[in-house]
Amino acid sequence: MKQIEQYIEQLRQQLRYWNFLYYAKDAPEVSDVEYDWLMMKLRELERQWPDLKTADSPTQHIGYKAQSKFRKVIHEVPMLSLDHIFNDTSFLAFDRRIRNRLQYGNNYLTYCCELKFDGIAVSLLYKHGKLIRAATRGDGHIGEDVTDNIRTICSIPLQLKDDGHIPRLIEIRGEVIMSEDAFRHLNETAKKNKSKRFANPRNAAAGSLRQVDPSITATRLLSFFCYGVGRIDSKKIPAAHLELLQQFKIWGLPVSNYRRYCVGHQEVLDFYSYVSKVRSKLGFNIDGIVIKVNALVQQQQLGFVARAPRWAIAYKLPANEQLTEIQNIDFQVGRTGIITPVARLKPVYISGAYISNASLHSFAEIKRLGLRIGDTVVIRLAGNIIPQIVNVVVSKRSIKTSPVLYPLYCPVCGSKVKQNNKEKTIICTAGMICSAQLKEALKHFVSRRAMNIYGMGGKIIDQLVDLKIIQNPVDLFRLNQDQLTCLKNMGQKKTKKLLDAIEYAKKTTFARFLYAIGIREIGETKAAYLADYYKHIDALMAADIESLTKIQDIGIIVATNVLNFFHNKHNIAIIEELCSPKIGIKFLSTLEKNNYFSGKNIVFTGTLAFLSREEAIDMLIALGARIRSSVSSKIDLLIAGKNTGFKLTKAKQLQIKIIEEAEFYQILGIR
């Protein structure tokens, strides 16, 4: 169990970091398929060991936090994801669960089945039939305002066709996609212009939709299909999902013709079989079908779980397979020193993407496959998205193949490695002396869920470490303008913003700090438990095994990891320096006398100049505030930035206390 728990936490930390790079920084360091493979692995492990599932796991959250370059949109009805299944048996189990919940016995349920588009989920808000706002899914609760870009998509009506039944307000949900023809045209143009080419149509659609300049989006030939509704203000609502889709068509909204009303499980399986056959002829990428209980009243009865509805599920299409060649095996060093083998492949095109890498995850996998460099292998996309080496085609093996030699020294720093036979891993023993481990540790330290140093991306950290400007987290807080402006793509303005962000990060929560310093097996949830119990770093550093194991989710192994961390003189020195007056990290707490916001219902309006909306919300939640999306008599406080809207007017009418941005920062004590 120990090894499983450690492995699960490693997967979570890696996925959180990749989320931060991909969604918050627009700087992915792995392909989508590598990311999705890891997510699928984590879901499976949490299914097998449900006691190890935590509320802060990436499997319990959707997508990403909205970026600062777009205005934030709060989804009043969350945009949830879907659970996935991969075989008929799993679907029959789903059908049985639904019938049992509805007390249907052996009677047939009716379903509406649609395509599962491989694109970007968006929300379109229409008021009296006029498009007034469009937003991305984001993390399911807060998305990005992409209204101007959505207006450039020809298939999306700016005004619904009036049939006398248009609701006062309706939120249409659907998927923005890029067709295969549009994708080829985009990459051919990019090749001629020597500009960035996209790996697959989904990435191209995402990048196109999130352009700051809508005129660029307009050239990308995006398409849209709607599949559902969020908020709807109308007395007349269709009784079934299929009727809702038909109503969308009447209003002029694009709805896929590949949808089917199914009575009972067999008709659903027949539709799945049909889609499997026509998939290659669609002209755009899909990765399965979506199966929804058709009756809306039954959907309401079934409700939701943490991140998905109970009344719908995605049945993924089978993995595509191709033959390719192992050109080399490289070794990557992670934050904890674990060395992971990665197969470099002769690029092969599978299901809309070029695949050139496949993680082998452990050296035991190389042994299991009997893999040699130069071998021909079968590679498939598990779940239609994750690159996986299935087996070696031994009959095609030539005399030119060579064995995979396990590293005796770290491929990055040259230090000796040690083997953990129990966990079947090879580990670099150098710690932060190894530049690879140092880089990964620092990237974790500055990440959004940790110290949240906005603008301190992976590329900047790589440069700072390579130039030996920083050697530990303390050095981040000693950076000056001269050191930063000498870096690539760092001008005066960007440097000033980064230095401001570093200064701002000194005010954090104790829980974030504990998560940031990288104690083995201490994720966000356990860090929060430790922070709540000990209140301050000095108390935690003096803790013993007895007090640690009294805390929720802290067993002997995790407690030992905490003790070992604080018995390390190097770690102690770094923490003491970070908390010293010279660096000045301070912990916010709901127990501080500066607790102006605790327990208050707060609404934001307008744009903040110094903090992003997301950062401000995180700070207030840490101080015990409750963030609301709309103004009502129950609101205690409105925080107003620039370019305020109707919320400010309504707050004045209701005589709600209003504070401007400067006063907000003054109360927080960060400016």
From Swiss-Prot:
CDD domains: BRCT_DNA_ligase_like, LIGANc. Keywords: DNA damage, DNA repair, DNA replication, Ligase, Magnesium, Manganese, Metal-binding, NAD, Zinc. Residues 592-671 form the BRCT domain. Its cofactor is Mg(2+); Mn(2+). One of its GO terms (biological process) is DNA repair. NAD(+) binds at D32, V33, E34, Y35, D36, S81, L82, E114, R137, E175, K292, K316. It catalyses: NAD(+) + (deoxyribonucleotide)n-3'-hydroxyl + 5'-phospho-(deoxyribonucleotide)m = (deoxyribonucleotide)n+m + AMP + beta-nicotinamide D-nucleotide. The active site is at K116 (n6-amp-lysine intermediate). Gene3D superfamilies: 5' to 3' exonuclease, C-terminal subdomain, 6.20.10.30, BRCT domain, DNA ligase/mRNA capping enzyme, Helix hairpin bin, Nucleic acid-binding proteins. The keyword Magnesium applies. One of its GO terms (molecular function) is metal ion binding. Zn(2+) binds at C410, C413, C428, C434. Transmembrane segments: none annotated. Its EC number is 6.5.1.2. One of its GO terms (cellular component) is cytosol. DNA ligase that catalyzes the formation of phosphodiester linkages between 5'-phosphoryl and 3'-hydroxyl groups in double-stranded DNA using NAD as a coenzyme and as the energy source for the reaction. It is essential for DNA replication and repair of damaged DNA. Belongs to the NAD-dependent DNA ligase family. LigA subfamily. NCBIfam families: dnlj, PRK07956.1. This is DNA ligase. It comes from Baumannia cicadellinicola subsp. Homalodisca coagulata. The gene is ligA.
